[in-house]
Amino acid sequence: MLILDRSSPQIFISNEQQDVDIDLQSVQRLVILFLELQKVSTDQVYIYFLSDAALAQLHDEQFSDPSLTDTITLPIDRPGIQSFPHVLGEAFVSPRAAMRFLGQYTEAQLYHEISRYVVHSLLHMLGYDDQTDEDKRIMREQEDSSLTFLAQNQALLHPTV
């Protein structure tokens, strides 16, 4: 578990999988810059990287669906809600899902896809949905523009240096 810089929101990060090496400071940088881009203020965000088995179990517990998925988001406090501490939510991500989705990939493509999963969860925490085709289109546009911004600011996920 990594907790950094108390002047910024606390980003709690737990890497409980062993499929992909993820630099935890890159996760913090991605989340902080994403929140700045979206002009969102919060006290805490939780990001968990899990194995497929652990994510499928959580999927079953939360949604009565034991199938594999790439990410699960549990929004807690909506932006603008007064609470202390303000907890935006929890994101549970399977890096192996990105490996499976991409098939053959470069290291850069893999970390870009895992970054997309984190951004996708953060967007859910902000209230974006992907239930209808229109919602999916809007969410994909938000993902793409956020990922472009993050890439330009060297804030995509990467392996430990």
UniProtKB/Swiss-Prot annotation:
Keywords, comma-separated and alphabetical: Cytoplasm, Endonuclease, Hydrolase, Metal-binding, Nuclease, Ribosome biogenesis, rRNA processing, Zinc
Location(s), subcellular: Cytoplasm
InterPro entries: MetalPrtase_cat_dom_sf_prd (IPR023091), YbeY (IPR002036)
Name this polypeptide is given: Endoribonuclease YbeY
Domain of life: Bacteria
BP terms from Gene Ontology: rRNA processing
Predominant localisation class: cytoplasm
Single Gene Ontology MF annotation: RNA endonuclease activity
HAMAP family attached to this UniProt entry: Endoribonucl_YbeY
EC number per UniProt: 3.1.-.-
UniProt: Zn(2+) binding residues: H120, H124, D130
Protein family according to the UniProt entry: Belongs to the endoribonuclease YbeY family.
Cellular component, GO annotation: cytoplasm
Pfam families cross-referenced by the UniProt entry: YbeY
Cofactor comment text: Binds 1 zinc ion.
Function (record text): Single strand-specific metallo-endoribonuclease involved in late-stage 70S ribosome quality control and in maturation of the 3' terminus of the 16S rRNA.
Cofactor(s) of this protein: Zn(2+)
Species assigned in the record: Chlamydia muridarum (strain MoPn / Nigg)
Lineage: Bacteria, Pseudomonadati, Chlamydiota, Chlamydiia, Chlamydiales
